[in-house]
């Protein structure tokens, strides 16, 4: 019965996607300048080139992936074009960083999460505002939004000047287990993508948000290579499962433990 239910879900999703034209993140379009006020870019002082994204969840805290940790991180907020600076762009450095596991010992299918406390709070502005944490986990089949300055080519590193956005769907975790043999039977990750491929997060999008109904439900973690292959969805750290840890850290409990 479980197998029949999974196959039925896959068929429904495939039929619904077949009527949608592929958009040319991978398979995305330039984000509207006003839809990503919570999106931040992470880069290092020396390189001055971003390597990851993150999500502003209040004036003092940014959510990203553990894999995005670096020394001398700089955080740029309010940015759209990397070539044209908005008047309200703000740059911050971390005051503290928190992990479920060490940034060196997380696994790619579990606990890929980093919480950054900014040295100075940011001010809300035309292009800067936090996004809400989830009130409930996302439903299977939910249409969600991914965004970032990651490569827009599956075969070569082609980074856009502006963030790209794409709509993808929450898929049954069994779809990702079928795609990636080493995935455990259960994990605190979301499986999301497009079954026929063509839309996906890719290199440079790590740490960025998966937005469902105006709430950050996932953190870009990892996926197939090349990006955007059929039946190779992406894996996203499930924010809802880490909600108690996030709220405890923000409240000042530095000894808070992550879910097992």
Curated annotation (Swiss-Prot):
GO CC annotation: extracellular region; secretory granule
Gene3D superfamilies (alphabetical): Trypsin-like serine proteases (2.40.10.10)
Pfam families for the chain: Trypsin (PF00089)
Top-level taxonomic group: Eukaryota
Disulfide bridges in this chain: 31-165, 52-68, 100-258, 144-212, 176-191, 202-227
Family to which the UniProt record says this protein belongs: Belongs to the peptidase S1 family. Snake venom subfamily.
The name this protein goes by in its record: Snake venom serine protease homolog 1
Organism of this sequence: Trimeresurus stejnegeri (Chinese green tree viper)
């Amino acid at each position: 019965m479980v197998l029949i239910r999974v196959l039925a879900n896959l068929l429904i999703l495939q039929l619904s996607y077949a009527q949608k034209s592929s958009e040319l993140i991978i398979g995305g379009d330039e984000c509207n300048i006003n839809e990503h006020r919570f999106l931040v870019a992470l880069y290092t002082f020396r390189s001055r080139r971003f390597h990851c994204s993150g999500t502003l969840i209040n004036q003092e805290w940014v959510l990203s992936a553990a894999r995005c940790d670096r020394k001398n991180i700089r955080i740029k907020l309010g940015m759209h074009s990397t070539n044209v600076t908005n008047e309200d762009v703000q740059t911050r450095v971390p005051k503290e960083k928190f992990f479920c596991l060490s940034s060196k010992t997380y696994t790619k299918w579990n606990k890929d999460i980093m919480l950054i406390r900014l040295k100075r709070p940011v001010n809300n502005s035309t292009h800067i505002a936090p996004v809400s944490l989830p009130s409930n986990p996302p439903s299977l089949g939910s249409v969600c939004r991914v965004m970032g300055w990651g490569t827009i080519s599956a075969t070569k590193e082609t980074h856009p000047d502006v963030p790209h956005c794409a709509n993808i769907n929450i898929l049954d975790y069994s779809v990702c287990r079928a795609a990636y043999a080493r995935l455990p039977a259960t994990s605190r990750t979301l499986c999301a993508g497009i079954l026929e491929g063509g839309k996906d997060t890719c290199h440079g999008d790590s740490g960025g948000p998966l937005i469902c109904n105006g709430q950050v439900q996932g953190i870009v973690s990892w996926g197939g290579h090349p990006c955007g292959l059929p039946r190779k969805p992406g894996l996203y750290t499930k924010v809802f499962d880490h909600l108690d840890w996030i709220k405890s850290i923000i409240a000042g409990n530095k000894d808070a433990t992550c879910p097992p």
